[in-house]
Amino acid sequence: MSEAARLIAPEKRGEDVDATLRPQTLDEFTGQAEARANLKIFIEAARNRGEALDHVLFVGPPGLGKTTLAQIMAKELGVNFRSTSGPVIAKAGDLAALLTNLEERDVLFIDEIHRLNPAVEEILYPAMEDFQLDLIIGEGPSARSVKIDLAKFTLVAATTRLGLLTTPLRDRFGIPVRLNFYTVEELELIVRRGARLMGLGMTDEGAREIARRARGTPRIAGRLLRRVRDFAEVARAEAVTRQIADEALTRLLVDSMGLDQLDRRYLTMIAQNFGGGPVGIETIAAGLSEPRDAIEDIIEPYLIQQGFIQRTPRGRVLTANAWKHLGLNPPKDVEASQFRLTLEDD
């Protein structure tokens, strides 16, 4: 199963972009309480001073609301919002066109900034620090450097892989914000709100069942909600109950912990082929026929958060929780092995 085909893949799809379901203010935004509280202060301070907000870097897994928060920030600052992504900005001229069209205090959002072309990144440094573009016009002996003044703007960037950002780029963000997976209670509120805006009846137990399987990710919660709605409407149910949600998601192969076929293949392969590990990431990628990046960025973060695997210097290792979830008997020394590997990791 490819990552794009997964119902619970956290990457954005066309169906996920529903403006009516998106919160419009920080007060409407559910979850990330600490980040929201700090952003409120920074936004109010910048607005009171009439200055551009310091550059902001959002770090965290896909689907946690980085784009939505950037849009809300622009709205609460009362400025324009421009959006792009790292891979789209192929050359310096593309970035120059974006930056020269910004007005004073505007917000420019760059998603996946870790995938920015290094040559483009060099142009971004003086733009962020001095609000100037340093461009080279011409070639060879006739080449000359031209400085272009820019409006004082705010760059809001998002990355799922902080380690891939260069130190000079990372250090130019005055406001780093780490986003974490959501609790079941927070996702339950998001599911209820979505159901209300859809005009869909929803019991508390139904909302909780969807939230439990949403992998701590609002984007996945919204996608599961839309699929459960389809089952409920065809069944002519007045409201989504726990039974309807459970039947729908079970038929969609999303289990009680939010794991799908690919997650279970990952865990089962380590259990049955490698005795629970340790096993290297390249071996896992080859066994699953999935790119290493997809495994590290998409599959593993949730499994680690749920306590199903450990990353150690010698490779990935299944925990007792994983063996129990798979319904398999772990090796007798699994707990002792995990303790030893943890000590080695430290």
UniProtKB/Swiss-Prot annotation:
<keyword id="KW-0234">DNA repair</keyword>
<dbReference type="InterPro" id="IPR003593">
    <property type="entry name" value="AAA+_ATPase"/>
</dbReference>
<dbReference type="InterPro" id="IPR036388">
    <property type="entry name" value="WH-like_DNA-bd_sf"/>
</dbReference>
<feature type="binding site">
    <location>
        <begin position="129"/>
        <end position="131"/>
    </location>
    <ligand>
        <name>ATP</name>
    </ligand>
</feature>
<dbReference type="GO" id="GO:0006281">
    <property type="term" value="P:DNA repair"/>
</dbReference>
<comment type="similarity">
    <text>Belongs to the RuvB family.</text>
</comment>
<protein>
    <recommendedName>
        <fullName>Holliday junction branch migration complex subunit RuvB</fullName>
        <ecNumber>3.6.4.-</ecNumber>
    </recommendedName>
</protein>
<keyword id="KW-0233">DNA recombination</keyword>
<keyword id="KW-0378">Hydrolase</keyword>
<feature type="region of interest" description="Large ATPase domain (RuvB-L)">
    <location>
        <begin position="1"/>
        <end position="182"/>
    </location>
</feature>
<dbReference type="InterPro" id="IPR004605">
    <property type="entry name" value="DNA_helicase_Holl-junc_RuvB"/>
</dbReference>
<dbReference type="GO" id="GO:0016887">
    <property type="term" value="F:ATP hydrolysis activity"/>
</dbReference>
<feature type="binding site">
    <location>
        <position position="68"/>
    </location>
    <ligand>
        <name>ATP</name>
    </ligand>
</feature>
<feature type="binding site">
    <location>
        <position position="67"/>
    </location>
    <ligand>
        <name>ATP</name>
    </ligand>
</feature>
<feature type="region of interest" description="Small ATPAse domain (RuvB-S)">
    <location>
        <begin position="183"/>
        <end position="253"/>
    </location>
</feature>
<dbReference type="InterPro" id="IPR036390">
    <property type="entry name" value="WH_DNA-bd_sf"/>
</dbReference>
<dbReference type="InterPro" id="IPR027417">
    <property type="entry name" value="P-loop_NTPase"/>
</dbReference>
<feature type="binding site">
    <location>
        <position position="63"/>
    </location>
    <ligand>
        <name>ATP</name>
    </ligand>
</feature>
<keyword id="KW-0238">DNA-binding</keyword>
<feature type="binding site">
    <location>
        <position position="311"/>
    </location>
    <ligand>
        <name>DNA</name>
    </ligand>
</feature>
<dbReference type="GO" id="GO:0000400">
    <property type="term" value="F:four-way junction DNA binding"/>
</dbReference>
<keyword id="KW-0547">Nucleotide-binding</keyword>
<keyword id="KW-0227">DNA damage</keyword>
<dbReference type="GO" id="GO:0006310">
    <property type="term" value="P:DNA recombination"/>
</dbReference>
<dbReference type="Pfam" id="PF05496">
    <property type="entry name" value="RuvB_N"/>
</dbReference>
<feature type="binding site">
    <location>
        <position position="172"/>
    </location>
    <ligand>
        <name>ATP</name>
    </ligand>
</feature>
<feature type="binding site">
    <location>
        <position position="292"/>
    </location>
    <ligand>
        <name>DNA</name>
    </ligand>
</feature>
<keyword id="KW-0963">Cytoplasm</keyword>
<dbReference type="Pfam" id="PF05491">
    <property type="entry name" value="RuvB_C"/>
</dbReference>
<dbReference type="GO" id="GO:0009378">
    <property type="term" value="F:four-way junction helicase activity"/>
</dbReference>
<feature type="binding site">
    <location>
        <position position="182"/>
    </location>
    <ligand>
        <name>ATP</name>
    </ligand>
</feature>
<dbReference type="GO" id="GO:0005737">
    <property type="term" value="C:cytoplasm"/>
</dbReference>
<feature type="binding site">
    <location>
        <position position="21"/>
    </location>
    <ligand>
        <name>ATP</name>
    </ligand>
</feature>
<dbReference type="Pfam" id="PF17864">
    <property type="entry name" value="AAA_lid_4"/>
</dbReference>
<dbReference type="InterPro" id="IPR008823">
    <property type="entry name" value="RuvB_C"/>
</dbReference>
<feature type="binding site">
    <location>
        <position position="22"/>
    </location>
    <ligand>
        <name>ATP</name>
    </ligand>
</feature>
<dbReference type="GO" id="GO:0048476">
    <property type="term" value="C:Holliday junction resolvase complex"/>
</dbReference>
<dbReference type="GO" id="GO:0005524">
    <property type="term" value="F:ATP binding"/>
</dbReference>
<feature type="binding site">
    <location>
        <position position="67"/>
    </location>
    <ligand>
        <name>Mg(2+)</name>
    </ligand>
</feature>
<comment type="function">
    <text>The RuvA-RuvB-RuvC complex processes Holliday junction (HJ) DNA during genetic recombination and DNA repair, while the RuvA-RuvB complex plays an important role in the rescue of blocked DNA replication forks via replication fork reversal (RFR). RuvA specifically binds to HJ cruciform DNA, conferring on it an open structure. The RuvB hexamer acts as an ATP-dependent pump, pulling dsDNA into and through the RuvAB complex. RuvB forms 2 homohexamers on either side of HJ DNA bound by 1 or 2 RuvA tetramers; 4 subunits per hexamer contact DNA at a time.</text>
</comment>
<feature type="binding site">
    <location>
        <position position="219"/>
    </location>
    <ligand>
        <name>ATP</name>
    </ligand>
</feature>
<dbReference type="InterPro" id="IPR000641">
    <property type="entry name" value="CbxX/CfxQ"/>
</dbReference>
